[in-house]
Amino acid sequence: MTNIRKTHPLIKIINYSFIDLPTPSNISTWWNFGSLLGLCLTIQILTGLFLAMHYTSDTMTAFSSVTHICRDVNYGWLIRYMHANGASMFFICLFIHVGRGSYYGSYSYFETWNIGVILLFMVMATAFMGYVLPWGQMSFWGATVITNLLSAIPYIGTTLVEWIWGGFSVDKATLTRFFAFHFILPFIITALVTVHLLFLHETGSNNPSGLISDSDKIPFHPYYTIKDILGAFLLIMVLMTLVLFSPDLLGDPDNYTPANPLSTPPHIKPEWYFLFAYAILRSIPNKLGGVLALVFSILILMLFPLLHLAKQRSMMFRPLSQCMFWILVADLLTLTWIGGQPVEYPFTIIGQLASIMYFTIILLVLPTVNLIENKLLKW
C-alpha cells in the first residue's frame, strides 16, 4: 500500500514542503530564522486573537480596555506582553533573515526575494498600526507624526492624510480603521508567506557556499525539523525571559499615559525596530526628501539583485565584501541608536553621516568592491 503522505492531495503538499523536501546538507543556523518567523507569526496571530476578544477600538475606552486586559482577564497580562514583545522578536528574526539573504546572495531568487521585501513592508505597516491601538501618548503622537508625513506628497498630500484619518485629526475613525487593518493584515501576510515558500521551493534553498547543491541533498525531516525545533525552543525561552522579567524593557513609558491631543511628549519616537528608518527620515531637512529616503531605505533591498556584480554568489569567499557588509550592519546599529536620541548636536550630524554612509555602501561601495574582487580573482 502506497504511503498516504505521498498520495493524499492535502498531505502530499505538506510532505513535499516539510518532510521529503530535498535540502542542502550544509545550511547553517542562519537558515533557522525562516521557520522562526513562521513561529513568531503564529504566536502573534494567536495572542492577537485573544487580545481582540477584550479590546475596544474606541478613543474613550481603548486605553482602559488594555488596562482591563492586564488586570482582570485571566493571564491577560501574559497575552498582552507576549504580543508586544513577540513583535520585537519578530523584527529581530526579520532583520537577521534579510541580513542572511544579503550575505549569502539569496536575492538571486528574484521572486522569493521581492515577495520577502513586500512582506517586510506589510509587517512594518502592521506593527505601526498595532502600536497605535493602546491609545497612549506615544501611540497617538506616533500615529499623528507618521501619517502626517504623507502630506509631503505634492498636490494630493493633505487630502490623502485627512482621508486616512477619517477627519481633521487622529481620532475615533482613525483608531477604528487601524484596528480593522491590524486585524486583517496578518492573515494577508500568512497568504503571502505561502507564496514566498512556493517560489522558494521552485528553486530549492540556497546554502552558505552559494554553489549548486543538487549533488548533496538530504531530506528535510528529521535533520532540519529537529534543528528548527531547537531554534523554536530557544526563541520561546528568550521571549518568555523578556516577558516575565522585564516586559517593558523595549516599550516607552509615555505609552502608560492616556492619549492627550493637547500635550505633546518631549521626544516622539517609534518602537526600536523602526528607529533606523526614523533616523534616516530625520536626517534630511526637507519633508518630502525625508519621506522618500525613508521609503527608499527599505525599497533599496529590491535593487540588491541588480547591484550584485560579483562572479560568486555568496560572500563566504569574498573577505572585502564581508568587511563592507559588517560595516553596513554597524551603520544600521548606529542609525538605530541615533533614532532614539533627541534632535540636537552631535546626534543630528552623526545621523546624517550614518544615513549617507548607508546609501553609499549599498549603491556604490559594495558593487565597486565586487568588481575589485573579480579583478583580484582574475575573473
Curated annotation (Swiss-Prot):
It comes from Callospermophilus madrensis. Heme b b562 binds at residues 83, 182. The keyword rRNA-binding does not apply. The chain crosses the membrane at residues 33-53, 77-98, 113-133, 178-198, 226-246, 288-308, 320-340, 347-367. Heme b b566 binds at residues 97, 196. Its cofactor is heme b. A ubiquinone binds at residue 201. Pfam families: Cytochrom_B_C (PF00032), Cytochrome_B (PF00033). Changing residue 324 to T: In strain: Isolate S98. Belongs to the cytochrome b family. Component of the ubiquinol-cytochrome c reductase complex (complex III or cytochrome b-c1 complex) that is part of the mitochondrial respiratory chain. The b-c1 complex mediates electron transfer from ubiquinol to cytochrome c. Contributes to the generation of a proton gradient across the mitochondrial membrane that is then used for ATP synthesis. Keywords: Electron transport, Heme, Iron, Membrane, Metal-binding, Mitochondrion, Mitochondrion inner membrane, Respiratory chain, Transmembrane, Transmembrane helix, Transport, Ubiquinone. The cytochrome bc1 complex contains 11 subunits: 3 respiratory subunits (MT-CYB, CYC1 and UQCRFS1), 2 core proteins (UQCRC1 and UQCRC2) and 6 low-molecular weight proteins (UQCRH/QCR6, UQCRB/QCR7, UQCRQ/QCR8, UQCR10/QCR9, UQCR11/QCR10 and a cleavage product of UQCRFS1). This cytochrome bc1 complex then forms a dimer. One of its GO terms (molecular function) is ubiquinol-cytochrome-c reductase activity. Binds 2 heme b groups non-covalently. It is found in: Mitochondrion inner membrane. GO terms for cellular component: mitochondrial inner membrane; respiratory chain complex III. Heme 1 (or BL or b562) is low-potential and absorbs at about 562 nm, and heme 2 (or BH or b566) is high-potential and absorbs at about 566 nm. Its main location: mitochondrion. The keyword Transcription does not apply. It is a multi-pass membrane protein. One of its GO terms (biological process) is mitochondrial electron transport, ubiquinol to cytochrome c. It comes from the Eukaryota. InterPro entries: Cyt_b/b6_C, Cyt_b/b6_C_sf, Cyt_b/b6_N, Cytb/b6-like_sf, Cytochrome_b, Cytochrome_b_C_euk/bac, Cytochrome_b_N_euk/bac, Di-haem_cyt_TM. This is Cytochrome b.
